[in-house]
Every structure is written in C-alpha cells, then in structure tokens.
Amino acid sequence: MVRANSVQLLGHYGSDEVIACSAWTSTSRELTDEKRARIPKLINTLWRDGHETPFEKGIVHFLVDCDIASHIHLLKHRISSLNAESARYKELKDDKVYVPVDFPDKWKRKLFLHTQTSDSLYHECLADIQGELGRKRAKEAARFFKTYNSQIQADVSFNMRSFHNFLELRDSEHAQFEIRDIAQQMLRLVQEIEGNPFEHTLLAWFRKKKNLNL
C-alpha cells in the first residue's frame, strides 16, 4: 500500500500569553489589559535577545506517518519526545510504503516491486523462524527485511523552543525532501490552530531569521 507521508496535529498546550506569563514570573504574573497589550513586543524581545526558556512552556503534539529514513531524522532530535510503532514488538501487517514523488516512473515501479519482495520475505521469515526462535526473537530478526521506505507511525511532541530547533534544521534547503515536507506540514498545522495561539512566537522566529529586529 503506497502512501504519502502525513502529519496530524493531536493537540497543543500554551500560547503567547502563557509564554509571556512564564517570563513575567520573575517580576509579577498578574495580567492586566496593559500587560496583555505588551505581549507581542515581549515575545519578540525574548526571542531576539536569546531568552528562550519561557518558550518551553508552549507544546505542540503530532502524529506522523512516515518512511523509516525520515523517522531516523526525527529521532536525531533528542529534544523532542517521541514514541513509535515498533517492528520489534508487533508484526507490521499493513505493509505501508512510501515511494519518492520525484522518482521517474520506471524507478517508482522498481522500488515498489523491490519493497513488495522485501515485505513478502519479512512475513515469510517471521512465520518460518518463530517456532525455532520464539515469537519475540522472530519479530526482532525478521524486521531486517523491511526497507527504508517502509512507513511507521510516530507520536512526537516538541516544546516551542525545541520545535524551532527542529524547523531550523529540517525546514531547510539543505534537508532531505521528505523530512522537509514533514516539517512544513507541522508548521502549517501550528499556524492553522484556531485562534492562532502562537502567532507572535512564530512571527518572532521569522523576524530573527530575516534579521528584521531593530
């Protein structure tokens, strides 16, 4: 089953206001209308000047279906919190696969056929060796037949400070196409949260990246 990599937003916690209140804890957390009006400027100043700890109070939470190669890119961000579908603990019965959209048609077909063969060997091996090795070890060993384009599901969350780090590295022209697409999907989902709770945080990131801060 060929599928595109996809991202769902499971939830979020916090907002620009929560981040601002965290910063104001050092003086007074009491919110007035006057202080609320200062939140956009405060958020921008905090990010511009490198006071990033308050941004850890905002959290975004995603469900990601992606190829194993992209999953490895997610794993490299140790500042995220991640749990994923495991071929060690379960048989991957659905045989979900990703085929690069920019492949020539000939190589799309070849990769799909190669993946079908590998998936068939995975299931055959698992069934054949579990009597000798036991179900647990059989699942561990048979998964070596799975290819890099096999898809698994991951539950991943970031605080807003670590999410920025992820976007800087993965929503980049230097990143691999697939993980860049995942990063862009994540950012778009955060931008589309009802009420735009992180509006000024995202704007502060953009300003600093473009050197628009005075």
Residue ranges and their predicted role:
Residues 1-214:
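Family-specific signature for flavin-dependent thymidylate synthase
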